[in-house]
Amino acid sequence: MSTNTESSSYSSLPSQRLLGKVALITGGATGIGESIVRLFHKHGAKVCIVDLQDDLGGEVCKSLLRGESKETAFFIHGDVRVEDDISNAVDFAVKNFGTLDILINNAGLCGAPCPDIRNYSLSEFEMTFDVNVKGAFLSMKHAARVMIPEKKGSIVSLCSVGGVVGGVGPHSYVGSKHAVLGLTRSVAAELGQHGIRVNCVSPYAVATKLALAHLPEEERTEDAFVGFRNFAAANANLKGVELTVDDVANAVLFLASDDSRYISGDNLMIDGGFTCTNHSFKVFR
């Protein structure tokens, strides 16, 4: 292959990697979702945030629109477990922006910590699966009805190291993230026939309010976030680097953009080698 062709291809990449794209992000009012929303908007995307947290979601939109001459961000109140809410959110994006190019399934629950399955609440288990799996499924379903006629699109779901290995969170969380990974691969097989890419990302521990549920009781300190960061650092494979919401957002940006135009059905690990390491051996420790 000609090196000249390669050079011209790379030099033509826009600095705003999502310029003109329309993205719908569930759970975009706080945490990783908020970081994704802000990064996408910075890269030229028109964004729709779907969340239950009206005040926080509205504030994110207001901050994005300061100095803007036109509406490039909307907040939509919606519950990912309710099909009508998701259908309406997709319709809203199309009505206001003309299409839907990108779906980010970020809304999720960690589930209540319970080390003994005999005491695990069925209602807690079902709620976690409803948000993490059913929510992702419904969002994929309704995004697909817009993307299939267009013969293009990118869907990225937030998975986890808990979708690859066991023992890193509540049973409902780990089980649901394994399901999201399987759903991603299954939907990628179908939608690839229509030019639509479907991927997921699996981060290691990120210090967000949602993630604090993963912290074992004996590791909890007066400052919950300090305790979580110390616990994550002690158990990480990659030392000296703390995984942040912005690191995850950058990985999602890569999969959402045309930079990854031939990547589909993939699970991008953002774990510093955590899941490829047998921590019981301690050979290098």
UniProtKB/Swiss-Prot annotation:
PANTHER family: SHORT-CHAIN DEHYDROGENASE REDUCTASE, SHORT-CHAIN DEHYDROGENASE_REDUCTASE FAMILY PROTEIN. Its main location: cytoplasm. It holds the Pfam family adh_short_C2. The gene is ABA2. One of its GO terms (biological process) is abscisic acid biosynthetic process. The biological substrate is probably 2-cis,4-trans-xanthoxin. It is an enzyme of class 1 (oxidoreductase). This is Xanthoxin dehydrogenase. Changing residue 28 to R: In aba2-12/sre1-2; reduced absicic acid synthesis. Keywords: Abscisic acid biosynthesis, Acetylation, Cytoplasm, NAD, Oxidoreductase. It comes from Arabidopsis thaliana. CDD domains: secoisolariciresinol-DH_like_SDR_c (cd05326). Induction: Constitutively expressed and not up regulated by osmotic stress. Belongs to the short-chain dehydrogenases/reductases (SDR) family. The keyword Transcription regulation does not apply. Its EC number is 1.1.1.288. Involved in the biosynthesis of abscisic acid. Catalyzes the conversion of xanthoxin to abscisic aldehyde. It is found in: Cytoplasm. GO terms for molecular function: alcohol dehydrogenase (NAD+) activity; identical protein binding; xanthoxin dehydrogenase (NAD+) activity. GO terms for cellular component: cytosol; nucleus. It catalyses: 2-cis,4-trans-xanthoxin + NAD(+) = 2-cis-(+)-abscisic aldehyde + NADH + H(+); 2-trans,4-trans-xanthoxin + NAD(+) = 2-trans-(+)-abscisic aldehyde + NADH + H(+). Predominantly in roots and stems, and at lower levels in leaves and seeds. The modification N-acetylserine is found at residue 2.
